[in-house]
Amino acid sequence: MNLPAVTPAKSDTASPMGEIIAVREAVVDVRFAAGHLPEINSALEVAWDGGAPLILEVHSHLDPRTVRAVALMSTSGLARHVMVRATGEALRVPVGEAVVGRMLDVTGIPRDNGPALPADVPRRAIHSDPPAMQTENASTDIFETGVKVLDLLTPLAHGGKAAMFGGAGVGKTVLTMELIHAMAAKYQGLSIFTGVGERSREGHEMLSDMNGSGVIRHAVLVYGQMNEPPGARWRVPLTALAIAEYFRDEQHKNVLLLMDNIYRFVQAGSELSSLLGRLPSRVGYQSTLATEVGAVEERITSVAGAAVTAIQTVYVPADDFTDPAVTAIATHMDSQIVLSRDLAAQGFYPAVDPLASSSVLLDPLVVGDAHCEIAEQVRESLARLKSLQDVIALLGVEELGSDDRRTVTRARRLQRFLSQPFTVTEKFTGQPGRSVSLADTLAGCRAILDGETDDWAESSLYMVGTLDEARQKEQVARKAAAGAAV
């Protein structure tokens, strides 16, 4: 889409003016007068007729008079000799109560066809340093999600960071949306959803779903969509962080920060790295990969009185978990949730791989001995089931020893019990969503491990909430079978 014609801006002494001397897609070179070179990461503005200014961000100084900037908007229609105004500061985006319930772009402009934001809305720079180490609150309080498999095997911490790893189509976005519901329902906190490289269709669907369910009243949506320049996708996590930091520091609110998909942030950085002429590193990624990821992740932390809990989805290219981008992101995480294509194909949702997923919080000193014992026994049962799959496929369960048959019986029931209907999928499945407390999850797994459900039909444990619900389902099935027999 072509932008309106450029109107050359008039120079003034308060705002140094520069002239565009080169445009290479999302990279723009600007020349200023001697002694007026803008600082790194400061914002530049190009005035357009009848529209918001095009925002550039200074990336490097080429010589004493020239800067190289990254465009945060489309540069279509931009030309040499156009005048640019230096703002003298980093991009500042709107924050506070006025943005709650709204969808914003990387520059903080509403994109939901709603009213304009108030003129006096507070603003905050997208670039800031992490809180001083002595002010950080290293909390180990558990963030209960109501999702059985997460609370049992990969507990999340208030103020911690968790990542959901998975390829395309395994349920990352659906699980993310369910966690937004959990934050609004259980903690009366604020959720900030960041769509990094999201498809426009997905963003529209999420906004519609949130409006329909009322969750939008407790959420802020910030999008850098797939069709936008790499600069927008590269900086949109910082816009979301600025909003989250305001609610944490100024209003002392708990914030759930969700990023879908942080891998697209890395991809955008890789695109810009090529446009900036840098030599690529392994697998074509930018040589500054670890630094860029660290700059985002280290700002996600908690201070006394308020927590920012971050959950990020990570696309795994070709399901290769050794990919440099995946490993760079994983090093910052407290909990790693791995979504399995095999489990998704079998209909087990959420398709969380209980053997590949992990959490540093699954420790007796944090969650208690009983929780750790049950989680370990569940993992052992599921690991044994996996190791026996080939034997079962060739010879059948009947050829196993009695101990292995018992283990397989209980492991299959555990698999089904850890599945769960979600609130966000109600309109597709027709099945009401379930949120299960940690106590009910532990009690249900304990009963299955003790053999209480050995004579139940496996289907009775599939897509239920608590064990009591499964018990009722089993009783109904038995009555129906008895009636059919008569």
UniProtKB/Swiss-Prot annotation:
It is found in: Cell inner membrane. It catalyses: ATP + H2O + 4 H(+)(in) = ADP + phosphate + 5 H(+)(out). Its EC number is 7.1.2.2. GO terms for molecular function: ATP binding; ATP hydrolysis activity; proton-transporting ATP synthase activity, rotational mechanism. ATP binds at G166, G167, A168, G169, V170, G171, K172, T173. InterPro entries: AAA+_ATPase, ATP-synt_VA_C, ATP_synth_F1_bsu, ATPase_a/bsu_AS, ATPase_alpha/beta_chains, ATPase_F1/V1/A1_a/bsu_N, ATPase_F1/V1/A1_a/bsu_N_sf, ATPase_F1/V1/A1_a/bsu_nucl-bd. Keywords: ATP synthesis, ATP-binding, Cell inner membrane, Cell membrane, CF(1), Hydrogen ion transport, Ion transport, Membrane, Nucleotide-binding, Translocase, Transport. GO terms for cellular component: plasma membrane; proton-transporting ATP synthase complex. Produces ATP from ADP in the presence of a proton gradient across the membrane. The catalytic sites are hosted primarily by the beta subunits. NCBIfam families: atpD. HAMAP family: ATP_synth_beta_bact. F-type ATPases have 2 components, CF(1) - the catalytic core - and CF(0) - the membrane proton channel. CF(1) has five subunits: alpha(3), beta(3), gamma(1), delta(1), epsilon(1). CF(0) has three main subunits: a(1), b(2) and c(9-12). The alpha and beta chains form an alternating ring which encloses part of the gamma chain. CF(1) is attached to CF(0) by a central stalk formed by the gamma and epsilon chains, while a peripheral stalk is formed by the delta and b chains. This is ATP synthase subunit beta 2. It comes from Gluconobacter oxydans (strain 621H) (Gluconobacter suboxydans). The lineage of its organism: Bacteria, Pseudomonadati, Pseudomonadota, Alphaproteobacteria, Acetobacterales. The gene is atpD2.
